[in-house]
Structures are given as C-alpha cells and as structure tokens.
C-alpha cells in the first residue's frame, strides 16, 4: 500500500503586540488500497496455473485545523465531516509572572488549581496532618481488661477445673 502525505505549516508574528502564532498539520493523505468487491481469481488445474488480480483505488483524506475532514475515493467526490470540538487542557495555562521571585513576591495560585491540587493530594493517600501510630497511642488511656459486675474470679487454674469436672 503506497501512501503520500502533504503537511502544512503556518506562522505569523506581530512584533508590536509581541504575539506569535504557529501551527502545523498533516493536510492531505493519498493512499492506494485494494478495492472491495473488485478482484479476479482463476485456476487451471490441468495446466497448474493460477491468476489473481485485485482492483485498487486511491483514497484521499484532507484535514484542516478548523476541525473539517474530507475523505473519499479519488475521482468519485469527497464526503465532508465536521469533527467535534475538544478542549485540550481542563484549565487555562497558569505561569507565574516572575519565575525567580521569592514566595512572598509570587502571585497566589488560582482557586481552580488549588482545588485540583487538594483533590489530587486526597486521592493520592497523602495526609498533611499525618501522625505516627506511637504518637496517637500515647494520647489514648491504658487498656484495662473488662470484667462483668458480679462475676466470680477463678480460683482454680483451667487444668484443675477440667480435672474437677471429670471427677
């Protein structure tokens, strides 16, 4: 299967406003594929000969940065499709104004980003106020075995009481 591709690149720069735009995309793809339902196969068992021929077609796919896609077979017209819009990032890109600034000079983190970071911390199993188990058990009262009121204490050991039951 042979394939040819054509890429496009657009760039523009506005020095007055200090803006620049650059885009590159794969615009046109032309590929040769076997054509469905267009094949010929012959066999001659007496002469031990076979003949096989497969029809081919050229498929054209054209993409654009405006989310339009045209595709079809070359010479038969193209079908146009509108692709769905998809945001690439869930949040706007945030960069501090001064990268080398101290913590006091920096701008506050946006609220959306703070909430996202807090959620990631919670889902990651990290706890900000984490304490060691030994510190927690120091704060607890000592463990005392519970006895029922009115219950008699054993006077004999277990083995002695078993012998007494046997008689």
Curated annotation (Swiss-Prot):
Entry's Gene Ontology cellular component terms: cytosol; I band; titin-telethonin complex; Z disc
Positions bearing Phosphoserine: 39
Subcellular location(s) per record: Cytoplasm, Myofibril, Sarcomere
GO molecular function: BMP binding; FATZ binding; molecular adaptor activity; protein-macromolecule adaptor activity; structural constituent of muscle; titin binding; titin Z domain binding; transmembrane transporter binding
Chain intervals for the UniProt region annotation (Disordered): 144-167
UniProt xrefs under Pfam families: Telethonin
Compositionally biased intervals (Polar residues): 157-167
A GO biological process held by the record: cardiac muscle tissue morphogenesis
Result after altering residue 132 to Q: Found in a patient with dilated cardiomyopathy; likely pathogenic; impairs the interaction with CSRP3, TTN and MYOZ2
Keyword Cytoplasm annotated: yes
Tissues/organs with expression: Heart and skeletal muscle.
UniProt keyword terms in alphabetical order: Cardiomyopathy, Cytoplasm, Disease variant, Limb-girdle muscular dystrophy, Phosphoprotein
Record text on subunit structure and interactions: Interacts with MYOZ1, MYOZ2 and MYOZ3. Interacts with CSRP3. Interacts directly with the N-terminal Ig-like domains of 2 titin (TTN) molecules. Interacts with ANKRD2; the interaction is direct.
Role according to the record: Muscle assembly regulating factor. Mediates the antiparallel assembly of titin (TTN) molecules at the sarcomeric Z-disk.
Miscellaneous comment as given in the Swiss-Prot or TrEMBL entry: The C-terminal domain appears to be unstructured in solution. It may promote the assembly of higher-order TTN complexes.
Linked pathology: Cardiomyopathy, familial hypertrophic, 25: A hereditary heart disorder characterized by ventricular hypertrophy, which is usually asymmetric and often involves the interventricular septum. The symptoms include dyspnea, syncope, collapse, palpitations, and chest pain. They can be readily provoked by exercise. The disorder has inter- and intrafamilial variability ranging from benign to malignant forms with high risk of cardiac failure and sudden cardiac death.
Protein name stated in the entry: Telethonin
